[in-house]
């Protein structure tokens, strides 16, 4: 299918990850499982090795549950399922099995945001934290850059369902999120106005009942001859302008990035670690 996979679970890495939002990674790290394949075709993808090239190995539901328990034994703050959409039925079975065997840390669903409501409804009761992208306000950008139609409508409807499930943000005593929603807005070079429209939409609808994560870490990993603006990083001025816009709106619950995070060293090696 579109995601380059069958229903058989395929993963590329299972390890502690320290570069998520502070309330997700904390000091112990997030127990991150990277799934192979993706339902988007972003031409600027930083994880192309696993999303497009489909690197990884097939594992059973039982093995996936064991990976979750192994990460918990390494003191992971949570189980972070990255690009999980196309394996949801199997993931739910693995969560059930892992919980029967002692899994008791939060489940993070780390998604592109391009989800069907039916899929999100399946996850009710299994996911504690939705860590979701909101990539585009302008659907033409979604078509051009990610090869999907109606990104805004699909993502906003899916987010509504996520909000119904986990609308009350909860944190542990040491500041780790245990339930809630973080919406990631990746700023693309020269497309700051699109990001502003997303922030405005989200704040008008949800106020500070969700957390925003406004990201400047876009990294041009290959030369793009079709969309030349993707060949540069986001300037400090562009990013500061968006942060000031969010502050002027009244946004209080948001993560921002300081300094230069647009570096390939922030991209994990996909080397089958932990499998």
Predicted regions, residues:
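Anionic-ligand binding region
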Residues: 143-174
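Conserved Radical SAM active-site core
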Residues: 3-129, 138-139
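A general structural detector for well-ordered alpha-helical segments in enzyme core domains, enriched
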Residues: 64-67, 91-95, 119, 123, ...
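Conserved glycine-rich "GG(E/T)P / GGGxP" loop and the immediately following alpha-helix
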Residues: 72-97, 144, 150, 160, ...
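Auxiliary Fe-S-binding modules of radical SAM enzymes
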Residues: 167-275
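Conserved radical SAM core fold
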Residues: 51, 88, 113-116, 134-152, ...
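Hydrophobic faces of well-ordered beta-strands that scaffold small-molecule active sites
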Residues: 31, 79, 107-109, 130-132, ...
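Non-cysteine beta-strand/loop elements that form the S-adenosyl-L-methionine
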Residues: 124-139, 209-218
């Amino acid at each position: 299918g579109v995601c380059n996979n069958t229903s058989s679970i395929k993963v590329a890495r299972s390890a502690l990850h320290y570069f998520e939002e502070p309330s997700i990674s904390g000091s112990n790290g997030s127990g991150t499982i990277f799934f192979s394949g993706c339902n988007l075709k972003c031409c600027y993808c930083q994880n192309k090795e696993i999303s497009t090239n489909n690197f990884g190995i097939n594992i059973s539901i039982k093995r996936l549950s064991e990976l979750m328990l192994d990460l918990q034994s390494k003191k992971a703050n949570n189980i972070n399922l990255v690009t999980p959409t196309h394996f949801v039925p199997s993931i739910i079975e693995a969560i059930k099995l892992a919980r029967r065997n002692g899994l008791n840390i939060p489940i993070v669903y780390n998604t592109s945001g391009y989800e069907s409501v039916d899929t999100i409804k399946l996850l009710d009761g299994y996911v504690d934290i939705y860590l979701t992208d909101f990539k585009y306000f302008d659907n033409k950008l979604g078509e051009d850059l990610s090869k999907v139609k109606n990104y805004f409508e699909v993502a906003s409807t899916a987010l509504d369902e996520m909000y119904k499930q986990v609308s009350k943000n909860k944190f542990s005593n040491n500041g780790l999120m245990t339930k809630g929603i973080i919406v990631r807005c990746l700023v693309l070079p020269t497309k700051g106005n699109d990001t502003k429209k997303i922030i405005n939409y989200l704040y008008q609808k949800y106020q500070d009942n969700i957390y925003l994560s406004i990201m400047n870490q876009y990294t041009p990993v290959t030369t793009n001859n079709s969309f030349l603006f993707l060949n540069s990083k986001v300037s400090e001025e562009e990013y500061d302008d968006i942060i000031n816009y969010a502050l002027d709106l009244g946004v209080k619950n948001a993560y921002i990035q300081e300094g230069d995070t647009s570096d390939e060293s922030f991209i994990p090696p996909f080397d089958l670690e932990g499998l």
